[in-house]
């Protein structure tokens, strides 16, 4: 046995040395390197950024990076294939942070759609744990809307989020990640639930409510789910069934109290509220979502939280989709709908000294680029054998 172990160690050491020799510039993180699922490889390709979050490729293959206190930067690498991207050259594209200043966390996310052109989706959240104003559509709180850009002219006044646009959803506390399913154009969001949750005055916050994957229909004329209420600020997704009780299952919606105006029956009335397509662990904090072009898989970045011990999230996970329906393959009651791609082997270093993913972007070769805001980094993650 010792001989075989020694041989394996020698083989792996030689293989790693070979890979590094093919890519002479290897950046190393200042913390334990993330763990990878079988069949995947990853490499740190940029350091020293200022809390990078949203990332997006331009038409020339450069990566646009939104950085806190900096603005928008553009980075281009020497591309030697697979995870070997070297010599990053950074240019500040937008250096004024004034144009990006936001006094709170209301308007959080933007998405331009492809299958229905000229539509800009905007998700507006809340700074509050529980926001009573979200109950009233007229406030504009906790909503997802689409805006038609084709009707704008240089003389047009700017859209007013509260009074303009096409309402896709209400009752979304903080749906930061938005994605368009590439084959049918279905609109999805990932929802961050509140903390400090109680039910009938009993603390259940460690494992409830769950984070959510919500479906908002299509922009091509179908009205399925559009304008629907997804529950917040009164109804929340079950993650831990035992803590919630009441015979509810994962993905059902529960009320914090049981009275005539707010109760579990009302929360689960499909004529009133739309339940999530999938539910994820409480406090895992999903912040971005992106689909493969063939519609078979989507990736979600879980930013993570310290609400539980050990901390949860701090990972990129995948969800399988049915390309003939544009819907997840897992049932809404599943607790195992995600498969981790890259995560931290020891989350005790989190949040300040570990991989903490936020934004994601896929390049033309199918490589997944990820920002880690806590560490000021960009990583590239590759399914082995999928690119040269």
Q: For each of these PLM feature ranges, what is it?
A:
Residues 202, 209, 359-388:
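Blade-level signature of beta-propeller repeat domains, shared across WD40, Kelch, NHL, RCC1
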Residues 1-20:
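Fungal secretory targeting signals
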Residues 48-61, 94-119, 167-182, 274-297, ...:
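Beta-rich, blade/repeat-based domains predominating
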Residues 74-100:
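Blade-loop segments of beta-propeller domains
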Residues 22-35, 126-134, 138-163, 173-174, ...:
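Beta-propeller domain segments
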Residues 32-58:
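Mature N-terminal segment immediately following signal peptide/propeptide cleavage
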Residues 62-66, 101, 119-123, 186-190, ...:
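Conserved beta-propeller blade signature
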Residues 70-71, 194, 375-376:
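Loop/turn residues immediately N-terminal
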